[in-house]
Amino acid sequence: MAEKCAFWNEYDSIAGHICYCELAAFNRPVNPNFLSAIGCSPEKRVECMKSMEYAVGKGVIPEELAPPVTTTAAPVLSCDPPPEIAKTLVGVAQKKATTPAPALVMLALLAGAYISLGAVLFIIVTNDLSLYIGDGLSRLVGGLSFSLGLILVVLGGAELFTGNNLLAAGYLDKKVTGKQVLNNWFWVYLFNFVGALLVVFLFYFSGIWQANDGSVATRIINIAAAKTSLSWSEAFFRGILCNWLVCLAVWIAMAGKDAISKILGIMIPIAAFVAAGFEHSIANMFFVPMGILVKGSELAQSLVAPALLQGITWQTFFINNLIPVTLGNIIGGVVFVAAAYWTCYLRPVEGNKIATDGKGIL
């Protein structure tokens, strides 16, 4: 009607759209001359009558005259609640446990390389940063830089041993067998090491480690020396704390529905573990072998005390660092994340349903 009658009003909250022809319904006489003046034909009056009857409660407004109906869509959550993450985790565990061997080893190699690329960025960014902003802030910036590795793993798609410790949730939920979990861990761990060593050799032969007047090389040596000089118990407990945070980063990334949410969810826990000085087995597959290669260079021997170089060996790497850190990583991921959240959200409880209302436990 709006396009048919120049005198159509905008809207009436009670009657909807009303034209001047309807004045007759309210005992306001409208003579034929007035109707002709406004261009109201008999056909138009039929349409107006329908609207008029609606206005006085005697009819239903025609569909074409009805006011627009507005609907409010349900808000879309920017992330899944914890119970949904737990279900997603079990589904991911099932998928990972059945990944074909060729794809599994390639994705594992890529993950080792990605974590090592994050380690390269960490070394370059922090080689002399503490001189300008202090140790604490340098650790934080280094942690944010290192998070590149897990971002590439999660968004790019790869198989990381420490993240795959979460497969334990699938085992607890009886969707994955223990044999499948151990098989996945073995091959992923092995080829994470291969991927890390690949980046070690590429970075070494690139010569970039000689940059900044040897400051980068010194940083590499200091990191490797610190890691190989840890006691067994120190390395073990730092490994637990590290993978607790790493698996939380993976857990949060699973909740995110867009790339930005996933990236932010990864960066903060990873920055925390790096800044605190916790130990990550796959990252150490880059840091210490890189130190072993660099320590034999004339540059390193001219810059670093011989006593510091002597402690960086394959033996100290495996015994003092990699073995205890790996065991700690497994406990941190399996016990404190996979088992903890499975118990909270998925463990069957007779006559009760635990925390499945979409809210976390505070």
For the regions a protein language model found, what residue spans apply to each?
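Cysteine-centered metal-binding/redox modules
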Residues: M1-E64
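Alpha-helical transmembrane segments and their helix-helix packing motifs
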Residues: P62-L362
